[in-house]
């Protein structure tokens, strides 16, 4: 933790806003550049603008963080090094990252730049933080859904610097777990192009249209003391696509209350609300898992009824000492803090007529114009009978200020970047390569996998001999009897020569983690193949609590590029699942050693802490499906996972790629998975009989931008 209580982190969509939020009191600013940012439709910064922004901020003791918080394709990864290098050399303070491959590359090639993991990484627990710390991560941006109590525990257990969202728009889905916009229209949130389908109306179980997936804006200004007690260091304001007046106004109020430590007045709270909100404010996630009062229910227009005046540009105070003596070089020494610079001109000559007036000379030096500086005091030592032309005084001032500016900025500059040879980042461990080669030479050169979430599905699937591997969902089992029930299923399946993996939940919050740790020793004794993991918490736990168990990454542990895949496999992972947003061409050009492909299944569009069941019918803690219907009359199943307390919203149609298995084999894929989630036994039979009436190809043909 840093010395100060908080860092106030503000958004900036352009250079004008960056300067405005800094003048309004931001300690740090996050921006997007021309590539790899999660706001692809924002103006974003050109290279020239971003370099100017870095200098402007550093002169004022403010940090600049660059968003590289999207998933990067293989075809793009080679551009990353050159893109970052110019900013790294200039002193960029940190990069905010989603892709584990980008984390690996930055840690390798840009050793003195901080790495902040994005909320897109969906980190919800201490074990996720522990895993990421192995890659040189210096700060973790917590998932917005994580409570203050959870943050406090994470900070106490790991000591990691934590960043939390404090103000602005809330996604309905856990960030990084949303494919809604991607699947419906090809605009991927993982690529910075979300079309915000959560802000549209839906019919729930035949009732009138409601904005059931739209959350109110976050406002945590009344919880500053509690955020401090929880160990949060950086307070993040959302809004890189917001206007200058909004950004500056919000920063101004947060700055005031951070510094004063006073309770927030009702009048100021209303003024903040007037700057902009969607149907009011909420800070519910800080204290509760979810709540119906967080939802807008009505059309979530962003309403702004007030504009704070733009802050005036404040100049930086410097001291000066002017020395003009006959026969000696004229000098102007300027100082800011502990940094000084001395500029010189030609030796001063004697006056032939009127000598130089001391006040006139000081006034001339004081004319700093449109520079960033102004003199607080100028000490002058001027001979009695000397003359210096105005042009020479102007040059002396310009050279002094320019030299001081360069010297102030030079301490941020870096020259320690390592040469990038990306091929060295993509290698897989030798045992993985050998295993794949052995698999390739086998008579049966591919594996068929099924995953199931219910007992009825398992009872149906066990009768099909075509499946070599079964993924059994963690939440099929009652917690009190999990070990015994799972052991029975493993024994039953292994008698049929089937391999078994335990498929862990999409979200693994503290309660789930504690339970998992408590059963780990007994679970490790069960003779099953390993785990399918869906988050960084599970990856760390399975890596450290079990011996001889394989770990497979599910599709949402994104291996969009070969560097990401290598990063995971170096930490003991045995296999990965091809990300759902890659198209056939991209799949052909990735390293598919150890990869499996989902060739059937309803794609999950959202994983959410808020519960559609609870918010429409009340919470009865009974798992069942209800359906959302959109304006095109498409129905989306919502499944409530009550043990882990999250919802999954599924696509209206299943994706079916079984006819493409031959092509996928050519791409080097050897394992093919049928992912059963919401299907009844009758629907499973239709899948196995190749009689699915309606289905989609997902992103196999089109992909995402």
Predicted regions located by residue number:
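Hydrophobic alpha-helical bundles that form the membrane domains of multi-pass transporters
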Residues: 135-136
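Active-site pocket-lining/capping segments in soluble small-molecule metabolic enzymes
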Residues: 2-123, 141-145, 149-234, 241-705
């Amino acid at each position: 933790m840093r010395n100060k209580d908080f860092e106030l982190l503000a958004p900036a969509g352009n250079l004008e806003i960056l300067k405005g939020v800094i003048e309004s009191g931001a300690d740090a600013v996050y921006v997007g550049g021309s590539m790899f940012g999660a706001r692809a439709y924002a103006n974003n910064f050109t290279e020239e603008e971003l370099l100017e922004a870095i200098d402007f901020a550093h002169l004022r003791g403010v940090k600049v963080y660059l968003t590289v918080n999207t998933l990067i394709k293989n075809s793009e990864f080679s551009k990353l090094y050159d893109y970052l290098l110019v900013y790294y050399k200039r002193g960029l303070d940190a990069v905010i990252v989603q892709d584990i491959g980008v984390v690996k590359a930055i840690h390798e090639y840009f050793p003195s730049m901080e790495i902040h993991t994005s909320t897109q990484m969906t980190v919800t627990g201490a074990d996720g933080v522990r895993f990421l710390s192995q890659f040189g991560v210096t700060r973790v941006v917590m998932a917005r859904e994580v409570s203050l109590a959870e943050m406090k525990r994470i900070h106490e257990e790991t000591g990691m610097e934590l960043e939390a969202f404090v103000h602005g728009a809330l996604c309905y889905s856990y960030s990084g777990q949303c494919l809604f916009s991607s699947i419906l229209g090809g605009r991927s949130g993982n690529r910075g192009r979300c079309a915000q389908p959560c802000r549209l109306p839906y019919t729930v179980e035949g009732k009138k249209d409601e904005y059931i997936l739209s959350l109110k804006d976050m406002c945590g200004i009344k919880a500053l003391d509690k955020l401090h007690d929880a160990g949060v260091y950086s307070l993040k304001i959302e809004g890189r696509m917001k206007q200058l007046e909004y950004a500056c106004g919000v920063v101004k109020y947060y700055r005031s209350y951070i510094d004063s430590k006073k309770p927030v007045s009702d009048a100021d709270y209303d003024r903040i609300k007037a700057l902009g909100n969607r149907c009011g404010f909420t800070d519910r996630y800080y204290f509760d898992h979810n709540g119906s009062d967080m939802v807008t229910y009505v059309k979530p227009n962003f309403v702004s009824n007030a504009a704070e005046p733009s802050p005036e540009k404040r100049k930086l105070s410097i001291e000066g000492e002017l020395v003009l003596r006959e026969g000696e070089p004229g000098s102007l020494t300027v100082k800011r803090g502990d940094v000084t610079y001395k500029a010189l001109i030609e030796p001063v000559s004697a006056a032939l007529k009127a000598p130089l007036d001391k006040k006139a000379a000081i006034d001339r030096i004081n004319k700093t114009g449109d520079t960033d500086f102004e003199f607080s005091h100028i000490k002058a030592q001027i001979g009695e009978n000397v003359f210096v032309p105005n042009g020479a005084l102007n040059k002396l001032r310009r050279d002094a200020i320019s030299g001081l500016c360069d010297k102030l900025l030079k301490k941020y500059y870096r020259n320690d970047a390592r040469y990038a040879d990306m091929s060295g980042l993509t290698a897989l461990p030798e045992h993985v390569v050998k295993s794949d080669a052995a698999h390739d030479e086998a008579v049966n050169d591919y594996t068929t996998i099924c995953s199931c979430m219910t007992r009825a599905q398992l009872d149906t699937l066990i009768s099909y001999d075509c499946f070599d591997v079964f993924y059994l969902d963690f939440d099929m089992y009652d917690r009190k009897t999990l070990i015994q029930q799972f052991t029975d299923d493993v024994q039953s399946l292994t008698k049929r020569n089937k391999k078994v993996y335990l498929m862990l939940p999409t979200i693994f919050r503290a309660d789930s983690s504690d339970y998992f740790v408590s059963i780990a020793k007994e679970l490790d004794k069960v003779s099953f193949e390993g785990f399918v993991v869906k988050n960084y918490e599970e990856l760390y736990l399975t890596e450290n609590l079990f011996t001889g168990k394989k770990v497979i990454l599910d599709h949402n542990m994104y291996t969009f590029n070969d560097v990401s895949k290598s990063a995971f496999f170096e930490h003991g992972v045995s296999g990965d699942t091809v990300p759902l947003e890659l198209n056939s061409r991209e799949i052909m050009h990735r390293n598919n050693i150890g990869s499996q492909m989902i060739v059937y299944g309803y794609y999950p569009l959202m994983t959410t802490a808020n519960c559609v069941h609870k918010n429409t019918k009340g919470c009865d803690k009974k798992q069942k499906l209800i359906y959302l219907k959109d304006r095109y009359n498409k129905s989306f199943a919502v499944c409530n996972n009550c043990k882990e307390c999250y919802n999954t919203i599924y696509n209206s149609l299943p994706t079916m790629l079984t006819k493409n298995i031959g092509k996928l084999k050519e791409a080097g894929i050897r394992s093919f998975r049928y992912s059963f989630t919401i299907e009844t036994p009758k629907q499973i039979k239709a899948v196995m009989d190749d009689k699915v009436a309606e289905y989609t190809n997902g992103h196999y043909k089109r992909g995402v931008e």
